[in-house]
């Protein structure tokens, strides 16, 4: 007797990719994620490739992973994919210290963020 399959976390014509620890603040990551929301997958990859933001590299990797998941795991058409969701949240916070003058120290906070990208297959509109 085998265990039943886990229910899908996204819809039938959708694929998902998640990065749990992206180094950088969620605010900065959300600025880049906002560039691709609602765009076609190919256009979104181009936007991220030529973006000057440092976080664009991490967002591009997650988007490429979501596209690969759609193609290989769910047999979706890559040319018809649209970025349905690009959500950002807080992850862990590393705490470090820096030495200061007169024997004192200061706390340094190094934030991490989570990124969840969902792509879906959009049907071509008949004209």
Swiss-Prot record:
Superkingdom is Bacteria
Write out the entry's keywords from A to Z: Ribonucleoprotein, Ribosomal protein, RNA-binding, rRNA-binding
Q: Pfam families, per this entry?
A: Ribosomal_L22
Query: What parts of the sequence cross the membrane?
Result: none
Gene3D superfamilies reported for this sequence: Ribosomal protein L22/L17
Quote the cellular component terms of the Gene Ontology held in the record: cytosolic large ribosomal subunit
Q: Supply one GO BP term.
A: translation
Q: Which InterPro entries match?
A: Ribosomal_uL22, Ribosomal_uL22_bac/chlpt-type, Ribosomal_uL22_bac/org-type, Ribosomal_uL22_sf
Q: Molecular function terms in GO for this entry?
A: rRNA binding; structural constituent of ribosome
- UniProt-listed CDD domains: Ribosomal_L22
How does this protein assemble? Part of the 50S ribosomal subunit.
Concerning its family, UniProt says:
Belongs to the universal ribosomal protein uL22 family.
Protein function? This protein binds specifically to 23S rRNA; its binding is stimulated by other ribosomal proteins, e.g. L4, L17, and L20. It is important during the early stages of 50S assembly. It makes multiple contacts with different domains of the 23S rRNA in the assembled 50S subunit and ribosome.
Q: What protein name applies here?
A: Large ribosomal subunit protein uL22
Q: Which organism is it from?
A: Rhizorhabdus wittichii (strain DSM 6014 / CCUG 31198 / JCM 15750 / NBRC 105917 / EY 4224 / RW1)
